[in-house]
Structure formats: structure tokens, C-alpha cells
Amino acid sequence: AAAKCDDVLNFLPARLTGGLIALASIGAGGGVAAAIKTMLADAPKHASPNAGWPEAAMAGGLGIWLAGPRTYGNRRVIADRFNASGRDARIGDIAAGLRVVQKAQIILAALLLIAGWPAIYPIAVQFGQLFG
């Protein structure tokens, strides 16, 4: 029951995060279009209904493949690769991925500020009158 609740509650945030990562992939190895294409094509391949969206967007955005067959402890997991035509990841892709995440956070903050400005502005004006 807890896992289903998690799936429901994270349905929109996972897709929003994937979209933000895709937008933030400008200038990264794969770019925005590849991030969106990979996200839409490969995210549903993930065993989780939500985890694949940001992971696939990052794979496309960086131009690398992620996921695929792997081993967890003694258990072998057989899974499709995200962005299967992408190159192998290199050490520099960790820093590039972190930059993409940072840009995604800035985009989200800007969107929240813009969306919230009509509500914030009157408070800011009153604050300025009180302390200005």
C-alpha cells in the first residue's frame, strides 16, 4: 500500500522533474531535444512508474546511456538502457549531470517566483512601506 501511495503522490513531480532536467540540458552533451525524446521514449521502460522520467531525461540530455543490465549485490537485473544509442558515461559526466541538476533547480525557482509574484508583490509593498 505504501509503494502504491508513493507512486500516486510522485506521479506529477517525477514528470515535472524530467521536464526540468530536459530544459536544463541546454549546452549539455545531448541537449534539450534529445533529453525530451529520450524521456518520452524510454521513461516507461523503467520498473518504477516514476523513476524513469528524470533518469531518461538525464541520459538524453547528457548524450549517454544509463540503466541497462546491472548487478545489485548478488542479484542480476536485466533492464533496457535509456538512450541506448548514447555513448558510455565518463567521469566528466558526473559534473555535467550536477550542472544540469543545478540549472533545473534555478529554472524551478524562477518559475515559482514568477508564478508566485502576484501573491508576493502586495506583501513586499507593505513590507517596504513598514520598513522603507
Predicted feature residues:
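Hydrophobic alpha-helical transmembrane segments
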Residues: 1-132
